[in-house]
Amino acid sequence: MKQFLMAMVAMTFVPAMALSQDKTDQMKITVHAGDTALSATLDDTAAAQDFASMLPLTLTLEDYHGIEKVADLGRKLDASDNPDSYAPKAGDITQYAPWKNIAIFVAPFQASRGLVRLGEFDGDFSTLSRSGPIEVRIERAD
């Protein structure tokens, strides 16, 4: 009976340990826009890891229909473990695979086939909402 109780207690901690492990697997990045540094977290997916392998990157983000800022990445990321479509929310960092671009959503949008979530901003990202092109440098956080 004592062994059974000890096993039950141990099993209650396994999910909590798994959750804390998931958080440490997520990579923190910094998006620099002028003098502003924006914190973001990449998901623990093949696509996000593939994107992280390209860092640091300097990109010019362009407006796209007032909903997102986009820039060409030059290649598709490994989306083997992602769903076929995704409905983004404001602050999501994604790749639209058919066009091989990064898309940072400044407003929510409907589910789109080929949209792959990479991560999200940790807080205010309104610097990226301004009109016109914005040069950014994306790098792993220290």
Indicate where each model-derived feature is located.
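Bacterial N-terminal signal peptides
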Residues: 7-15
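N-terminal secretory signal peptides
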Residues: 24-79
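Well-ordered alpha/beta subsegment
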Residues: 25, 119-142
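Positively charged n-region of N-terminal signal peptides that target proteins for export
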Residues: 1-4
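Beta-strand-rich cores of mature extracytoplasmic or soluble domains
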Residues: 97-122
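Boundary at the C-terminal end of the N-terminal hydrophobic targeting segment
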Residues: 18-20
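Short, surface-exposed secondary-structure edge patches
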Residues: 83-87
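Loop/turn positions that initiate beta-strands
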Residues: 90-92
